[in-house]
Amino acid sequence: GLGNAGADFTNDPSATADLVGFLLTDPAEIAEWQKWAGRIRATSPFIQMPVLGANPADNLAAALFAHRDRTTLAWSDTPLLELPPTAAVPVDVPAWWTLSRKSSMFYVGGGRGDHARIMMTASTLCVDTVAEAEAIDAYFPDVRAYLESLTPPPWPFAVDAALADRGRVVFEATCARCHGTYGDTPSYPDLVIPLADVGTDAALAAGSAQYAARFTDWFNGSWYGQRGRLEPQAGYIPPPLVGVWATAPYLHNGSVPTIAALLDSRQRPAYWTRTFGTRHSDYDAAALGWQTTVVDHGHAGEPDRARRVRLYDTTLPGYGNGGHTYGDALSEGERSAVLEYLKTL
């Protein structure tokens, strides 16, 4: 249920797509492979990212929609809509276990109604008819039910119960109005916070608004939009925080490596890297996030590609780590208490 925060979209996938099917001999399998490889080639310019962990999901969906007939879902080698920009805005994939607590799937408030139909757009890479989509739709309620049943893993280390209880009081006074309450009677306000208020990198929300006339309208007018709706807003949704300790990095673009830095903007590095491992030694149990190495330069100053793709540069467009400065007003003791409380969610 946890999004892959280390997924690698830094390479052109079209070369490997062409190689995958060389050992096939069955004509039907070869035809399916060639169809898939051709679509990988068509979309690959729109899903290549400069850093590991940055996900191009929104751009991929837009590129797929551009090649699809909205009524029949038939693939067109010639784009039917203007294609999205090749520089994809990054998103950090949310944990699936938050899905049951919110009405919108996406950071910008889009993806309401039947989430199953929205999830199914991932199949538009190879689904070519409404009949094929309906066959998937027949069993997708079970997929949706499974995803809604997911729960976060418990914090694997000791918790200071007294400190966590003090943190709950601070959290409910300062954070709950946006992120909800937890415990026996949980609540979630399901708000969209305007960009001017939250102050986080605006590129994702701005892009959703800019291309809505093409891609949002395509979805809402298609078979998928008969039950689901894409209605992006000019702001971001504060996520539910169940299992938040396990979901680093933070903000919608993954620009902040730890919750400690999220609660104190002075701790946020402009340029940082990590091991991209998943062992206990790769996790910072004090700061709640990844063990991070701060560096003194961004992508422009890193000639080695292997190092560059592991370097998060917050000066790149769409990768900014500003905003969400609400925790700056807390004392150090209050922030420590909130961190302890978040371990219990």
Which stretches of residues belong to each language-model region?
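Periplasmic c-type cytochrome electron-transfer domains
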Residues: 1-345
